[in-house]
């Protein structure tokens, strides 16, 4: 039985990456990454910086207080770009979620750097629509202002009020 080609492994890794992100299972998200994996949210207008695995965990913990029913999927497998020699795959993705600021949808271009065996992700670059992201941030800030909140309020929520971010820093998952 022949083993899967590098191309097939990279495509499978991309699908697994999206499925795990959608699952919301943080342990599975981190298990798919190498210990040194960095996530780059590539949007200069948000002045983002790379996130290591611990920061990624914190990022998603914050997100769980303002967003739920998050989904992340590949839009069109036919537009994937696979670099077998470099062990990289690029693909268009979409995301959606319900948030305390209302529905959120965005499109992303994702590049994954895989390990030599294509089993784990060693680097992530996410490019997203900054206008849609800023719209969400504005809605979250308005919700926050209406509540008189000035910080992440995960520990001060009640009922369906899941808290909102303190400012327009790009901490909300793309």
Swiss-Prot record:
EC number assigned by the record: 5.-.-.-
Keyword Iron-sulfur assigned: no
Keyword Isomerase tagged: yes
Gene Ontology terms: biological process: paraherquonin biosynthetic process
Highest taxon above the source species: Eukaryota
Listed GO MF terms: isomerase activity
Entry keyword set: Isomerase
Functional pathway: Secondary metabolite biosynthesis; terpenoid biosynthesis
Family: Belongs to the trt14 isomerase family.
Subunit structure comment from the entry: Homodimer.
The protein's role, per its UniProt record: Isomerase; part of the gene cluster that mediates the biosynthesis of paraherquonin, a meroterpenoid with a unique, highly congested hexacyclic molecular architecture. The first step of the pathway is the synthesis of 3,5-dimethylorsellinic acid (DMOA) by the polyketide synthase prhL.
PANTHER family: AUSTINOID BIOSYNTHESIS CLUSTERS PROTEIN F-RELATED, AUSTINOL SYNTHESIS PROTEIN F-RELATED
Protein name (record): Isomerase prhC
Source organism: Penicillium brasilianum
Lineage start: Eukaryota, Fungi, Dikarya, Ascomycota, Pezizomycotina
């Amino acid at each position: 039985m022949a083993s899967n080609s590098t191309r097939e492994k990279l495509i499978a890794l991309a699908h697994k990456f999206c499925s795990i992100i959608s699952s919301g299972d943080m342990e599975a998200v981190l298990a798919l990454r190498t210990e040194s994996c960095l996530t780059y949210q590539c949007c200069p207008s948000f002045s983002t910086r790379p996130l290591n695995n611990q920061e990624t965990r914190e990022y998603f913990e914050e997100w769980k207080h303002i967003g739920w029913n998050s989904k992340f999927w590949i839009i069109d497998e036919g537009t994937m770009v696979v670099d077998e020699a470099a062990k990289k795959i690029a693909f268009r993705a979409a995301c959606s979620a319900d948030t305390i600021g209302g529905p959120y949808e965005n499109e992303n271009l994702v590049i994954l750097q895989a390990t030599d065996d294509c089993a784990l992700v060693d680097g992530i670059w996410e490019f997203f629509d900054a206008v849609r992201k800023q719209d969400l941030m504005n809605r979250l800030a308005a919700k926050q202002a209406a509540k008189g909140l000035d910080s992440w309020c995960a520990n001060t929520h009640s009922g369906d009020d899941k808290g909102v971010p303190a400012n327009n820093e790009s901490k909300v998952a793309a």
